[in-house]
Amino acid sequence: MQTLHALLRDIPAPDAEAMARAQQHIDGLLKPPGSLGRLETLAVQLAGMPGLNGTPQVGEKAVLVMCADHGVWDEGVAVSPKIVTAIQAANMTRGTTGVCVLAAQAGAKVHVIDVGIDAEPIPGVVNMRVARGCGNIAVGPAMSRLQAEALLLEVSRYTCDLAQRGVTLFGVGELGMANTTPAAAMVSVFTGSDAKEVVGIGANLPPSRIDNKVDVVRRAIAINQPNPRDGIDVLSKVGGFDLVGMTGVMLGAARCGLPVLLDGFLSYSAALAACQIAPAVRPYLIPSHFSAEKGARIALAHLSMEPYLHMAMRLGEGSGAALAMPIVEAACAMFHNMGELAASNIVLPEGNANAT
């Protein structure tokens, strides 16, 4: 049975030769070079992923939604009752939540995964529960390091199993009341930013309660002293089971050489952890949308990412990842279905990259 260390060691590097071939092919399509902008660079990125066999392509699509409750909810950092996590997880099994509707539109399957809901098991939800909610990060660690490592490995294996069954494009999502608080703590730690710069309203927290949320994040970091150079340490001390789960999806997909669409702010925090744990993950991550949450810009700048969509969204659940899946498919369609300049006897002069 593969260990977490072995999984991280075996993440493949992108295929530079395949990327060069893809770029050459794209430059020969019926258009001025570079005129399809980031659609072209996305196709080249996909071509370099070993799990796609040297060409941009999309097979089955899946959005993995990690569901968990958080002990820090007790600090008054969320407006929704904690039970909403379980209620919404059940609604996901019925296909009625935002991510389910958008994923269905994109032709993707939603996998609802319980990694720490504080309720009885829910029919139709995959059970990877570590505990009924994680610890309150304002007074101590979210979980033990062993719990974090075990969950990373379990989710990574689940992701790789889906890849073996034909999934070639993954999206990550989460569900958990109060989870923007640990996400903000993680972003603060990884980027060296003060909590005031990265704490936002989450799921409509009143402005009058923002200062308390900022204070909670600062206390969590001061009490737990997470090491920003150790991604697992940060996850276990100031993260949460859902954030660990999303990180595990990224590690597993990268191990299989396959792309992962990020969602919003919560997924940015998990991406920061994943890239700290295994920098080789970075080429497999695709930013979907620019979250409206306050700390989004800082997190994305640290990741050196520019999302494809600006929709003022902050729902979470994987909704942005699902919404961006057709963009990935469009990059593949461009690559495979456009005609070639040579076949039409068109010779473009050099310097036409900006032509329209």
UniProtKB/Swiss-Prot annotation:
Chain sites annotated for binding nicotinate beta-D-ribonucleotide: 174-180, 203, 265, 291, 314-315
Record's keyword annotation contains Glycosyltransferase: yes
| Ligand binding (substrate) | 88
Site, Important for substrate positioning, might be proton acceptor: residue positions: 174, 317
- Write out the entry's keywords from A to Z: Cobalamin biosynthesis, Glycosyltransferase, Nucleotide-binding, Transferase
Return the SUPFAM superfamilies for the record.
Nicotinate mononucleotide:5,6-dimethylbenzimidazole phosphoribosyltransferase (CobT) (SSF52733)
Pathway(s) this gene product operates in, as recorded in its UniProt entry: Nucleoside biosynthesis; alpha-ribazole biosynthesis; alpha-ribazole from 5,6-dimethylbenzimidazole: step 1/2
* Record note on disruption phenotype: No growth on cobinamide (CBI); double cobB-cobT deletion mutants do not grow on CBI and DMB.
A Pfam family assignment: DBI_PRT
Q: What class of enzyme is it?
A: transferase
Tell me a Gene Ontology molecular-function term this record carries. nicotinate-nucleotide-dimethylbenzimidazole phosphoribosyltransferase activity
Further comment found in the protein's record: In vitro assays of this enzyme are performed at pH 10 because at physiological pH (7.0) its activity is undetectable; this makes it difficult to assess the role of mutagenesis of potential proton acceptor active site residues (Glu-174 and Glu-317).
The annotated subunit structure for this chain is: Homodimer.
Q: What is this protein called?
A: Nicotinate-nucleotide--dimethylbenzimidazole phosphoribosyltransferase
Q: What is the lineage of its organism?
A: Bacteria, Pseudomonadati, Pseudomonadota, Gammaproteobacteria, Enterobacterales
